[in-house]
């Protein structure tokens, strides 16, 4: 059997996250069903990360074994023909049996889209968080810079997150203006469950209330979940890229 790496994209709006669940539609479940039809036996996929309910991906990485003899171009076409239009295989390639999408990943990049313009089309809110009040991008970036480096992110973790260590290293965190949108980009070693959404929601809350930007670092350093503010909606978050070098 050969091990294959797949780069995939998906709209997570109608799914209960990436990870398979027995009675609910998930990204993993849909892909494994498609692979089983092609492979004529069950296929278990591994992923670089498990996105939450409603979260999307531009370049998620998965791997799986397949026993049938088929070239990658035809395999890609076959898988996509069995998937719904909101999940796509973008690229396939062979990898060594030792490759693990999650454990070999060096960094992950997430992007979060904030719609910050009253003059917008209704559908522009579909995958963005609409904030009516005009946001000060300079203040947001001052808070974002406080994330750079190694920090304990207990404040921005979720009670249900059973990860032993809450220490994560952040390499990049910045807000950029893009037409009607403010886009938050963050690159880190890995992320806790709902961590990015909690960070974004807290920064926006501080900005809307015109509190001192130093409030953010105090909240981060408190290592206490009760001091985090609103958790921003899932619909605006994308797993953008996974780095292996």
UniProtKB/Swiss-Prot annotation:
Its EC number is 5.4.99.12. One of its GO terms (biological process) is tRNA pseudouridine synthesis. Substrate binds at residue 110. GO terms for molecular function: RNA binding; tRNA pseudouridine(38-40) synthase activity. It catalyses: uridine(38/39/40) in tRNA = pseudouridine(38/39/40) in tRNA. It is an enzyme of class 5 (isomerase). Keywords: Isomerase, tRNA processing. The active site is at 52 (nucleophile). Coiled coil: none annotated. Pfam families: PseudoU_synth_1 (PF01416). Formation of pseudouridine at positions 38, 39 and 40 in the anticodon stem and loop of transfer RNAs. Belongs to the tRNA pseudouridine synthase TruA family. NCBIfam families: hisT_truA. Homodimer. HAMAP family: TruA. This is tRNA pseudouridine synthase A. It comes from Borrelia duttonii (strain Ly).
């Amino acid at each position: 059997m050969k091990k294959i790496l797949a780069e995939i994209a998906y709209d997570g709006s109608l799914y209960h996250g990436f990870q398979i669940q027995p009675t609910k539609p998930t990204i993993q479940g849909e892909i494994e069903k498609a692979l089983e039809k092609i492979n004529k036996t069950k296929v278990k996929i591994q992923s670089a990360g498990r996105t939450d309910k409603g979260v999307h991906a531009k370049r998620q990485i998965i791997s799986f074994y397949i026993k049938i003899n088929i070239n990658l171009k035809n395999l890609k076409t076959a898988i996509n023909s069995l998937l719904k239009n909101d999940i796509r295989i973008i690229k396939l390639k062979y990898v060594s049996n030792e490759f693990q999408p999650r454990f070999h990943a060096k960094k992950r990049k997430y992007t979060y889209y904030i719609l910050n313009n009253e003059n917008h089309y209704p559908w522009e809110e579909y995958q963005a968080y609409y904030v009516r009040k005009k946001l000060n991008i300079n203040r947001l970036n001052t808070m974002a810079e406080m994330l750079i480096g190694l920090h304990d992110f207990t404040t921005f973790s979720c009670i249900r997150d059973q990860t032993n260590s809450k220490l994560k290293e952040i390499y990049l965190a910045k807000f950029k203006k893009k037409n009607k949108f403010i886009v938050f980009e963050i690159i880190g070693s890995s992320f806790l469950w709902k961590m990015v959404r909690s960070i974004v929601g807290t920064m926006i809350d501080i900005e809307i209330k015109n509190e001192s930007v130093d409030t953010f670092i105090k909240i981060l350093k408190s290592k206490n979940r009760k001091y985090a503010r609103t958790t921003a909606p899932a619909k605006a978050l994308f797993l953008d890229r996974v780095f292996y070098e």
